[in-house]
């Protein structure tokens, strides 16, 4: 028994011919081009955070200008003139036995001494803040170093500056994990994964609490002036707490340098339309429609406070960010939204629910 033949199948289009992949031509560099070659580096942090992050970096970066040097030189000459004139008055009062003038000179000397002591203290605190940047550079070099002998002493100095006791469990785990055969990169990396997260967790809690208080305060307060004053106070307090956690004592000039960033935060908090319309790109349209203008403004101000806290952490932290351990804005976003929604639900009457 024979099977019937199958009918012929006609194809409309021609068969596709396989094409060999085309490769780019080989590029070669001569010796001159190889010597002048430099890899392009991209600042990933600024690309991720945007233009606002660049403005914050510029506000935190120390600036040196000719006008500043001239002002400092003038103040130094004025101070020397005041001291010289005071010495001359004291000598004249002693020779003429003018005890009233002599007492005034003594009081002035005490005031000047207190002022000089305050300036020296502020300069030391400002130097300590700048020294932290050098410590980060040193830590970055150690994280790329294969030498030995420097990593352990460096980490022990950081622990002492942060006020971590030798009996702390995290520090004890670090001591148990290191041994003599490890290089500086491995020792510092272990410190960054075992000890540093303890301080980072405390700083995160401070940021979360401050941002939540700012969010709820602005969401329920009807006075814009009170909101701005509250944000300024909370942000300054947040900076001080984060600096204290990382072993840095801020002085007047150190706070003054960071106050530019606080003013930037206040300016964004005052722009309710910008926060409500532009700042809702990370929220769904349904949630944005349910939130009131004050609640949206409160969330925006809270997120900006979080950004301020993250920048303060980056400035005061002795180690650079590694292995994506930098806190992100999205880590605090859901918590702020949940707190605002919970507050709005509590404020509604049973009939409204």
From Swiss-Prot:
Question: Is-annotated flag, keyword Transmembrane?
Answer: yes
Keywords tagged on the record:
Cell inner membrane, Cell membrane, Membrane, Transmembrane, Transmembrane helix
Supply one GO CC term from the record.
plasma membrane
Q: Which Pfam family, just one, is annotated for this protein?
A: DUF697
Q: Which PANTHER family match?
A: UPF0283 MEMBRANE PROTEIN YCJF
Q: What is the lineage of its organism?
A: Bacteria, Pseudomonadati, Pseudomonadota, Gammaproteobacteria, Enterobacterales
Give the record's membrane topology. Multi-pass membrane protein
* Descriptive protein name: UPF0283 membrane protein YcjF
Where is this protein localized, as stated in its record? Cell inner membrane
In this UniProt entry, which residues form the Cytoplasmic topological domain(s)? Answer: 91-99, 234-353
Name the predominant localization. membrane
* Stretches that traverse the bilayer: 70-90, 100-120, 213-233
Family of this protein: Belongs to the UPF0283 family.
Domain of life according to the entry: Bacteria
Periplasmic compartment spans:
1-69, 121-212
Is Cell membrane among this UniProt entry's keywords?
yes
């Amino acid at each position: 028994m024979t099977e019937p033949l199958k009918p012929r199948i006609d194809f409309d289009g021609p068969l596709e011919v396989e094409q060999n992949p085309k490769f780019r031509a080989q590029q070669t560099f001569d010796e001159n081009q190889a010597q002048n070659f430099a890899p392009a580096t991209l600042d990933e942090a600024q690309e991720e955070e945007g233009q606002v992050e660049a403005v914050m970096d510029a506000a935190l970066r120390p600036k040196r200008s000719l006008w500043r040097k001239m002002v400092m030189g003038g103040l130094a000459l004025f101070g020397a003139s005041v001291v010289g004139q005071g010495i001359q008055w004291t000598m004249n009062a002693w020779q003429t036995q003018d005890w009233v003038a002599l007492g005034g000179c003594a009081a002035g000397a005490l005031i000047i001494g207190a002022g000089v002591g305050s300036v020296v203290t502020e300069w030391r605190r400002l130097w300590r803040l700048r020294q932290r940047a050098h410590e980060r550079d040193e830590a970055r070099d150690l994280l790329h170093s294969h030498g030995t002998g420097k990593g352990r002493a460096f980490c022990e100095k950081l622990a002492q500056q942060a006020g971590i006791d030798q009996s702390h469990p995290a520090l004890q785990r670090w001591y148990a994990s290191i041994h003599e055969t490890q290089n500086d990169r491995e020792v510092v990396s272990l410190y960054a994964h075992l000890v540093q997260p303890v301080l980072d967790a405390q700083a995160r809690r401070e940021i979360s609490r401050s941002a939540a208080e700012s969010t709820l305060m602005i969401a329920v307060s009807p006075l814009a002036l009170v909101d701005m004053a509250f944000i300024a106070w909370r942000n300054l307090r947040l900076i001080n707490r984060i600096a204290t956690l990382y072993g840095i004592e801020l002085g007047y000039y150190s706070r003054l340098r960071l106050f530019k960033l606080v003013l930037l935060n206040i300016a964004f908090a005052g722009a309710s339309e910008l926060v409500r319309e532009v700042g809702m790109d990370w929220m769904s349209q349904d949630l944005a429609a349910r939130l009131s203008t004050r609640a949206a403004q409160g969330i925006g101000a809270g997120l900006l406070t979080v950004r301020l806290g993250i920048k303060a952490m980056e400035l005061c932290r002795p180690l650079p960010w590694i292995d994506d351990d930098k806190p992100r804005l999205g880590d605090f976003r859901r918590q702020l939204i949940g707190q605002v929604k919970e507050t709005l639900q509590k404020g509604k009457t049973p009939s409204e629910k």
